[in-house]
Amino acid sequence: MKSWFSKTFPEYKKLPKSGKFMVWLTFVQGLVWVVLAVIQSVQGLINNIAWAVFFGILLFVLGVLALSAAWNAFKFRAVGFKRMTYVYMPCLFQIVFVGEAFSFTYYIESVLQLSFSLTVHKLTFGINFAAILFIVLAGRNYRHLKMVSQNTDKNVEPLEQGQETQS
C-alpha cells in the first residue's frame, strides 16, 4: 500500500540526495516564513505599526515563493530549484546601522544559517554562508533536472558524481 506522499509525489524518488535535502529545507523555510508573517502582521495591526505589517506581507510573499519552489521540486520540475535560488537570495546579507537619530536593519533569517559579521563603528555587515551553499546546491540540482529533462531516453538518467555503473 502506497502512502499519500508516494501517490502525490511519485517523482520524488528520482531526486538526488542533495535535491531531497533542499526540497525539505525549502518546505520548512516556507512554513516558518508564513507563520512568522502572520504573527508579524497581527502584531503590527495590534500595535498600529505600518512597517511591521509591510514586513509581514514581505515574509508572506517569500513564504509562498518557498512553498511553491518546494512543491515544484517535489514534482521533479526544474522550475522548483530555480525558484529556490530566489528564495535564499534575500538571506545572503545582514546590514545593521545604528546612528544617533535612527537605526536601519536588514536581515531575513533562514532556517539554517552560518553567518559571519563585521562591525565597524556603527555599521555591521554580515554574510550568511549557509545561504550561499543553498543557492549553489539549488543551482546544481536545477542543472541536473535540466539535463535529465533534455535526455532523449526517459529510462536512462545521467549518473551523479561518485556513482558507479552497474554491469
Please state what every model-predicted region is.
Residues 1-167:
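Topology signature of small-to-medium multi-pass alpha-helical membrane proteins
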